[in-house]
Curated annotation (Swiss-Prot):
UniProt gene name: ndhJ
Full protein name: NAD(P)H-quinone oxidoreductase subunit J, chloroplastic
GO CC annotation: chloroplast thylakoid membrane
Pfam family, any one: Complex1_30kDa
Key words, A-Z: Chloroplast, Membrane, NAD, NADP, Plastid, Plastoquinone, Quinone, Thylakoid, Translocase, Transport
Length: 158
């Protein structure tokens, strides 16, 4: 069994890997970072015009980082949305993923948060900078190998 998007990608010989279905029947697809920008545009044109969420996670200490996208396509009415989950895995030493800001504007703050917490750089993002942590913060706080500083002084906290 495949989602409509997965079947379309297979038909057009676009490389991806199915990671299975979740409990709601939503398929998760693994896409290579170098293919993500073109597959994002194809997904949008195919009808996945709503980016429900973008997030990131650390797969394992010293392992890969993942950028995750939940896309929705409403073709047969709002009570029957078709959803797909896209995962892009990148090495932690040089975590670069093409930004999808230019496809889904709602990716703006979400990609910035993933950058701020995990250090994933979103190539061609127009304003990629910290959004939650101070600009002076060192490190990526949600990585599993992050060492919490013993003390951090907040300047001008008034």
């Amino acid at each position: 069994m495949q989602s409509h998007l997965s079947a379309w990608l297979v038909k057009h010989e676009l490389v991806h890997r199915s990671l299975g279905f979740d409990y709601q029947g939503i398929e998760t697809l693994q896409i290579k970072p170098e293919d993500w920008d073109s597959i994002a545009v194809i997904s949008y044109v195919y009808g996945y015009n709503y980016l429900r969420s973008q997030c990131a996670y650390d797969v394992a200490p010293g392992g890969f980082l993942a950028s995750v996208y939940h896309l929705t396509r409403i073709q047969y009415g709002v009570d029957q949305p078709e959803e797909v989950c896209i995962k892009v895995f990148v090495p932690r030493e040089n975590p670069i993923v093409p930004s999808v800001f230019w496809v889904w504007r709602s990716a703006d703050f979400q990609e910035r948060e993933s950058y701020d917490m995990f250090g994933i750089s979103y190539d061609n993002h127009p304003r990629l900078k910290r959004i939650l942590m101070p600009e002076s913060w060192i490190g990526w706080p949600l990585r599993k190998d992050y060492i919490t500083p013993n003390f951090y002084e907040i300047q001008d906290a008034h």
